[in-house]
């Protein structure tokens, strides 16, 4: 059986909405370009961009805990560095994530949007060459970057076992495929 890629997604800001991609060029040992490049850290999160280390998603705003984030759509333009945050098609914020002022605007937006659901001042974090991956580096691995794959047959099997539909996007994979 042939394998067919049915969808490709990246998540430029960890915990926020997916961006559908038509195609992507992958490099060995790398994740999708700009996938999980940024994260929005909670006030208590310690992160050193000069010496980045893996941190659990609980250190950042995320859909699993901060359900209100599902109301928003985000788009990141890698060339300009601009993140656009929208709700039902209306732009709420457009800010350059590659500049301190833009990062402050994004952090302030989410602090106001989420209100008391988050603790401490939020901040945008980034470290060149680092991806805020969902899993830490495996023993003996040569990289901590990965591309997450899901066979749609696995989703169908899960739906059959549960007796209910499952939204494949809940798994936040990069590549969905049929076959194999």
Q: What kind of feature is each model-predicted range?
A:
Residues 1-180:
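Electropositive, beta-rich accessory/interaction domains or terminal extensions
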């Amino acid at each position: 059986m042939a394998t067919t890629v049915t969808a490709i997604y990246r998540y430029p800001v960890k915990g926020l909405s997916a961006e559908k991609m038509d195609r992507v060029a992958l490099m060995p040992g790398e994740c999708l370009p700009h996938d999980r490049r940024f994260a929005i850290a909670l006030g208590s999160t310690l992160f050193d961009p000069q010496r980045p280390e893996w941190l659990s998603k609980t250190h950042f705003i995320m859909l699993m805990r901060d359900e209100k984030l599902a109301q928003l759509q985000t788009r990141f333009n890698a060339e300009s560095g601009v993140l656009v945050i929208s709700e039902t098609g209306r732009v709420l914020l457009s800010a350059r994530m590659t500049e301190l002022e833009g990062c402050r605007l994004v952090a302030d937006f989410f602090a106001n949007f989420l209100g008391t659901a988050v603790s401490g001042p939020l901040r945008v974090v980034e470290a060149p060459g680092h991806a805020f991956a969902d899993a830490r580096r495996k023993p003996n691995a040569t990289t901590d970057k990965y591309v997450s794959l899901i066979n749609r047959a696995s989703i169908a099997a899960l739906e059959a076992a549960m007796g209910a539909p499952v939204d494949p996007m809940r798994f936040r994979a990069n590549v969905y495929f049929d076959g194999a």
